[in-house]
Design a protein with these regions (language model features):
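Chalcogenol-based redox active-site neighborhoods
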Residues: 1-220
């Protein structure tokens, strides 16, 4: 069965560049981003992992951990990390999972479950579907899933924007409009009646249509 938004993120125990982890225990009571890449020592992936390393302080501020995954070995990850730091200017400062038996990739739907063989037998093209992103909440449920083609590097700034939205809407009964950024107006969700909205937003709201109710971003 394929994973859906709202499903519990499958737990696993795995070897990483920072030692063995139990995924759910590693997440703890915060947020996590699990992102995978098709192959070590490839150009697009090199730029991605270097860039996200530079953004780690931004994720830390949001109580969100980062963890990478590919079907390469932990030893390969460590060697490749030297190239990433040399070429991208940022040292990899988060763990990378070595999923050499393909089990995590299969569990998360990155590789067909009936695929046989080992990671050593697979090329980057074989692993083309292993360029996924999962945002996981403190309840260990999947909040966002993205799959990118091999030829397109991911926009991790957009991932921060989405994380801001997810964290805000987890606390308040609002949704965020197109291209929303922190500090901009948000939308009262339809499930909140006008009577309840008056209690939660006593200063009122802008309403160009009855079903569109805009308010300033709630403060924690």
């Amino acid at each position: 069965m394929s994973l859906q938004l709202g499903d519990e993120a499958p737990n696993f125990v795995a070897e990483t560049t920072e030692g063995k982890i139990d995924f759910h225990e590693w997440i703890g009571d915060g947020w996590a981003v699990l992102f995978s890449h098709p192959k070590d020592f490839t150009p697009v992936c090199t730029t991605e992992l270097g860039y996200v390393a530079g953004l780690k302080p931004e994720f830390d501020q949001r109580n969100c951990k980062l963890i990478g995954l590919s079907v390469d070995s932990v030893d390969d990850h460590k060697e490749w990390s030297k190239d990433i730091e040399e070429t991208q200017g940022n040292a990899v400062n988060y763990p990378l999972i070595g999923d050499t038996d393909l089990q995590i990739a299969k569990t998360y739907g990155m590789i067909h479950p009936n695929v046989s063989g080992t990671a050593k037998e697979r090329t980057a093209v074989d692993n083309a579907t292993v360029r996924s992103v999962f945002v996981i909440g403190p309840d260990k449920k999947i909040k966002l899933m993205l799959v990118y083609p091999m030829s397109t590097g991911r926009n991790f700034d957009e991932l921060l924007r989405v994380l801001d939205s997810l964290q805000l809407t987890a606390k308040h009964k609002v949704a965020t409009p197109a291209n929303w950024k922190r500090g901009e107006k948000v939308i009262i969700v339809p499930a909140v009646s006008d009577d309840d909205a008056k209690k939660q937003f006593p200063e009122g709201w802008e309403s160009p249509k009855p079903y569109i109710r805009m308010v300033p971003e709630p403060k924690d």
